[in-house]
């Protein structure tokens, strides 16, 4: 099999012929048809994010066709078309069985291994690590079976490849994490892949208004197509003032889909619900006023 391998942050990826071991229990082999290019991979490739084992095959969102299944896999068979998600869960640990699968003890997407901590890819007998359990920058990959979500065989796999990260993160933030009710107001800061899907999620639950905020006005046409009722160009207008002019009191839910601390600190919301996208937010939250969580009753939560 071939894969684009990152040997060292800051260096170009190199296409290599790798050995791929057979799937173990609860694992499947997927022939990759399409891969998304996530900003998380860029952060890893350029060294902005550190601590990853090398060499590594990047790619945390993709779609393909199941080629082989390991023991105990019941919901998949060869020939199935699947979306690959970077956040599979084991379904067996304490957190999974108590309804908190986002804390799954075996899910370690940035540690480079599968659920047992080992890899299935190797080069000259040395391990090559899997990014986000998926490693979609490869012609084939072994992934946890729960990472592969079956879809209709007539769905375009190039389109489906995007669902495993930005769509599930953005829509899931609205429906599952924040549980935005119909009629609630919401603002989305950052109208990229995840922000657009927050907007789409808001439209699905009939939130109103849905305010898109970005410094690039060229993104607003598509934001409106997905459900934004208003758009604020933050390069021209103060978004806090603009949002308060539109809502009188600020929004009920503010979704921060861009990793800029000043955006979070603007506090352009009413009741303090601030779900954060899947970026390292610890430093950002540390920069908030110390009384923000207590005095204002704020809730800072990652989207996925």
Residue ranges and their predicted role:
Residues 21-35, 48-97, 102, 110, ...:
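Glycine-rich beta-strand-centered segment in the early N-terminal region that forms part
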Residues 86-146:
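Cysteine-cluster motifs in flexible loop/terminal segments that predominantly coordinate metals
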Residues 139, 146-148, 152-237, 241-242, ...:
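Mid-domain Rossmann-like dinucleotide-binding core that forms the NAD(H)/NADP(H) cofactor-binding site
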Residues 265-304:
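C-terminal hydrophobic helical "lid"/dimerization subdomain
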Residues 242-252:
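A short acidic, Gly/Pro-enriched loop at the edge of an enzyme's catalytic core
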Residues 19-20, 53-59, 128-133, 139-140:
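Short Gly/Pro-enriched turn/cap motifs at secondary-structure boundaries
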């Amino acid at each position: 099999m071939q894969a684009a391998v990152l040997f060292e942050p800051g260096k170009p990826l190199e296409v290599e012929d790798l050995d791929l071991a057979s799937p173990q229990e609860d694992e499947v082999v997927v022939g990759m048809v399409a891969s998304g290019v996530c900003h998380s991979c860029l952060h890893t490739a350029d060294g902005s994010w550190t601590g990853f084992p090398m060499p590594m095959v990047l790619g945390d969102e993709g779609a393909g066709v199941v080629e082989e299944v390991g023991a105990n896999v019941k919901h998949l068979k060869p020939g199935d078309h699947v979306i690959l998600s970077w956040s599979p869960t084991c379904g067996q640990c304490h957190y999974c069985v108590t309804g908190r699968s986002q804390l799954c003890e075996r899910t370690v997407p940035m540690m480079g291994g599968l659920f047992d901590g080992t890899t299935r890819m190797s080069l000259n007998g040395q391990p090559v690590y899997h990014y986000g359990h998926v490693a979609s920058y490869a012609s084939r990959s072994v992934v946890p079976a729960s990472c592969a979500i079956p879809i209709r065989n007539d769905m375009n796999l190039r389109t489906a490849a995007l669902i495993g990260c930005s769509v599930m993160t953005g829509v899931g933030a609205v429906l599952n994490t924040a549980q935005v009710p119909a009629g609630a107001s919401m603002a989305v800061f950052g109208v990229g892949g995840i922000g657009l899907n927050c907007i789409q999620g808001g439209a699905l639950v009939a939130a109103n208004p849905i305010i898109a905020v970005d410094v690039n006005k060229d993104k607003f046409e598509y934001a409106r197509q997905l459900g934004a009722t208003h758009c604020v160009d933050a390069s021209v207008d103060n978004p806090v003032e603009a949002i308060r002019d539109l809502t009188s009191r600020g929004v009920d839910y503010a979704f921060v889909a861009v990793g800029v601390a000043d955006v979070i600190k603007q506090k352009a919301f009413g009741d303090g619900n601030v779900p954060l996208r899947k970026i390292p937010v610890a430093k950002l939250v540390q920069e908030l006023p110390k009384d923000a969580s207590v005095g204002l009753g704020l809730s800072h939560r990652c989207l996925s």
